[in-house]
Structure formats: C-alpha cells, structure tokens
Amino acid sequence: MNKKINGVLTAIVTTFDREGAFDPMKQREQVRRQINAGNGIFCGGTNGEFFVLNEQEKIAVTTTCVDEINGRAPVVAHNGEISTRETIRLGKQIARLGVD
C-alpha cells in the first residue's frame, strides 16, 4: 500500500445485475477492459456508485477488482463513510485486500 502509483487509473463503474445486486462477473469484464487498454483502476468511487453500496458490497467490489488485476496494474479503492470512525475502520479492511 506504500508503493508509488504511475499511469492512468480509470474510475470504473460498479456493475449490477437486473435485480440490482453487485455482478462480480461483469465487474471482472470491466477490469479486464481497462487492463487491456493499459490502465489501472479506481474502484468503488463516484462512478462506482459508492453511495448505494453497503459495506459488504464495497468489500466485494474491491476484492473482485484486486483479484482480477492480480498485480498486473495498480488498483486504488474509494474509502469514505459518513463518520471518520467508520472511514478509518473500513479503510483498514480495504487496505488488507491488497489495494495499491
């Protein structure tokens, strides 16, 4: 988590199925498209619909992206909650997932 990040990081959307649930397979497709274009990713931010995701979904989105990238490109995840305490708590969880 302390490495220097270079290059383009695309703020990707979070994918959902027809029922409104997070769709990890479609998310992996999004990630692969960006990797193939030579980009790293920023997941779970404004384009990633962070404001409609619960904590489990935020972790699932980040886990899916980190897993799919598998060290081939940088991945940065949004971390922002209503309270500072919750932001710090979630940030610690997200940091353990392998984001850059």
Feature annotation, model-predicted:
Residues 2-100:
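Active-site beta->alpha loop and helix N-cap motifs at the rims of alpha/beta catalytic domains
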